[in-house]
UniProtKB/Swiss-Prot annotation:
Source organism (scientific name): Saccharomyces cerevisiae (strain ATCC 204508 / S288c) (Baker's yeast)
Function of the molecule: Not essential for sporulation. Might be a component of the cell wall.
Keywords associated with the record: Meiosis, Sporulation
Skewed-composition ranges (Polar residues): 22-37
Region (Disordered), start-end ranges: 14-37
UniProt-recorded name of the protein: Sporulation-specific protein 4
Gene name of the record: SPS4
Any one Gene Ontology cellular component term annotated for this protein: lipid droplet
Leader sequence segment: none
Amino acid sequence: MPSNLNIVKVTKPQEENKNFLHKNTNEPNEMEQSQTQEAVTENFTENSNLSANEHAARRGRLNLKTVDHIETYPIVQETEEIAKKIALTRIILAQTKPRIDKVVVSRPVQAVAPVVNFFDKMANSTLSTVERVVPSLKTKTYKRLGEEIALPYTLSKKYGKQLRDTTARNGDNYVYQPVHGRLMKFRKYYNEKFIDTKGKPLIRGQLDPVLLPVNNTFEKVTVKYLPKGKKVPNDSFSCEFNRGLALEYNFMTRAVSAVSHQVVGIAKLPIAYGYHTNSVYNKNLDKQADLKMKNVLRGTWDTITDLEREIWASVTDRSLFRFFGNKSEGGDLPHLVQ
């Protein structure tokens, strides 16, 4: 009997293992999941420890919790990302950051670390209090900031459009429609009693043979040179005189839109060129081993050479600033001048 019991004790785990191996392989392995979670936790802890060690190496006994607190704000993080893409900022940080780190860990600064930490703690507490009063500090971004700055313009535009629409609707309902209705009744009356003008105005309708080719030519020229705009319907006017007025109004709206677009494009030209210059500068800085002054001067000279070559190439093939319409390696440039 004891030997049988021993056999049962040995074979039972084997059967359980066999059943476990024959389970559906699509089901997640709890042991693997736990190991993965532990690995992720260890990596996160390791990264946190590395970050803390880096701060300790750079700051010594200084805590500077206020600085760390401010760096958690989205708008500050966005500012840092923008600054990293500006060539001049990269150069300034590369030249000053090592010196600042040396000053921070120097003996005179470390000697007054307790005093600095005391005021830093007070400043951090004050910042936490401000966050409770103004919680939007934790979520503020440049996009939201721009929306808040543009809020007066957005509201004035919205309610201005509502006012214009209401005024136009009231004018149509209470002025144009009653007057136009009486004119149509009078026209119907003299068409029946005196002269049949076939629904056209008595005087303006006589000008149709002259105005029809003029209106057609004017419409073709407008669409050819000012393509952006709504098309004027041909079958919704009682005479060519009225259609001509609509074509003139359509021409003015298209012209204003085209001129404003060109003005905006020309106004953006210096910004676009500055953006292009920064992209070329960053590309040449990335080619250097580091951002020491010698390599910075070399990258600056290469940038000046590249920009000069671009301008001369644009002048010689009579396409000055055509490269604004192309994509730069640093990002998309506005399509300004062709």
